[in-house]
Amino acid sequence: MKFSQAVQDFERYLLLDMNRSANTIQSYRRDLAKFQAYLTEQGIDNVEAIDELTVRAFLAKLSQASYAASSTSRMLSSLKQFFLFLRKEGILETNPMSLVHRPKQGRHLPKVLTAREIEALLQAPDTSSPHGLRDRAIFELMYATGLRVTELVQLKLEDLHLELGFIQTLGKGDKERLVPLIDEAIEWLEAYLEQVRPSFLRLAGSPSPQEVFLTERGKAFTRQGIWKNLNKYVALAGIKQNVSPHMLRHSFATHLLENGADLRMVQELLGHADISTTQIYTHISTQRLQEVYRKYFPRA
């Protein structure tokens, strides 16, 4: 079977049989496209011609290109699922991934913003302008909920339950979760919905977009748009380090734990399937505790 046909069948399986989200399928597609580019270089067109040595040579090439261990691990996961599917469907007699294992990943502590930096960032947008009011609502919501940027741009009007003080979102693995909101985030969100979104919506086509956050042309906001705006406000706020949207999520979790939140509660708020993923934030809090201790204890 041609590799391209096998990928199409795999994507159909993910969508129809496994009910995977469009973002999940797109991630698989990106990884398999990289693998296919390598196969093309090697003159391999059919999945039957792929063996363990082919896979290992591909992974070695990624390593030589300084591919991050986490990215290699994700690539391995994609390839494992792909070849498991081909084996299950009887397209392959053997699985070339059966003896290929994940690389060990070093522990990297996520970077976070201080409470003062968060406040400076939230104050940066000019809320007297429509764009500034929208952006203030976006960053207030991201920090108050720990939403992933993908979850934010996919948030629909029907997901807002502001009168009850929470939103619902669809996270990784299509897991739905409820996230409470503080009053200040609700106030900024309501101000955007009442004062800005209707004017942006006038330029939208039909049917009207249901996404909460829109561009001035009435289009749903994109991940790239969030990144671009964030970089602008980071500069305005005088924050010296590079800041990504995910750092707001890291900061949300870390600040909760620093102020005494229960680890299990933070796990639920973040939508982590495994609490070990959440435990990384306890290491950040411990590290910062040690920094404060060394700075202020007279004999440290």
Where are these predicted regions, by residue range?
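Conserved catalytic core of the tyrosine transesterase superfamily
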Residues: 1-300
